[in-house]
From Swiss-Prot:
Its EC number is 3.4.21.88. This is LexA repressor. Gene3D superfamilies: Umud Fragment, subunit A, Winged helix-like DNA-binding domain superfamily/Winged helix DNA-binding domain. The record marks A94, G95 as: Cleavage. It is an enzyme of class 3 (hydrolase). PANTHER family: LEXA REPRESSOR, LEXA REPRESSOR-RELATED. Homodimer. It comes from Limosilactobacillus reuteri (strain DSM 20016). Keywords: Autocatalytic cleavage, DNA damage, DNA repair, DNA replication, DNA-binding, Hydrolase, Repressor, SOS response, Transcription, Transcription regulation.
Amino acid sequence: MAKLAKNKQMAVLNYIHKQVEDHGYPPTVREICSAVGLSSTSTVHGHISRLIEQGFLQKDPSKPRALEITPKGLDILGVKPIQKEIPMLGVVTAGQPILAVENATEFFPIPPSIQDNNDLFMLTIRGTSMIKAGIFNGDQVIVRKQSTAKNGDIVIAMNDDNEATCKRFYKEKTRFRLQPENDTMEPIFLDNVKILGKVVGLFRDHIF
């Protein structure tokens, strides 16, 4: 009985992988029922729960269909993870704003665990204004493209002069504040600001 249940779990995992590969999103529970020969949705939910417990699947609550196969899940299926790459768009200052370079000439490999790579890009930081947030001169930040931000988010922002900077974002009553994480530096106040993206990760190829 245990072997049969395990075989069904692998069938569920394999079908989820196939649907994601073919369509870009996982199947519904009822579609899984039909595909693997199960009549009860609760049985499928049970298999999914056990696959999550074993580390073969994970849930992303930010997505409507939240199932994702982990690197461990791909490994047990014998599938080699596809190496993902994101564009490196140049240098952005973490001190005074400079023009951001948006011509991708290089690409940076990222782990399979980092999803939505089509919405990510990388910039190299120049300056010391974000050191209290752990972002140092020469670091490369991974940025998710988005045009909005919440107070306290670390963002790449552009002003009306098309100058970009890495700062912590705050919306105040009559203006926007781009706050450095360095006690020796002053915030930047703007009437208008364009958000290019939110910093979601960091890569450093050196140690201090």
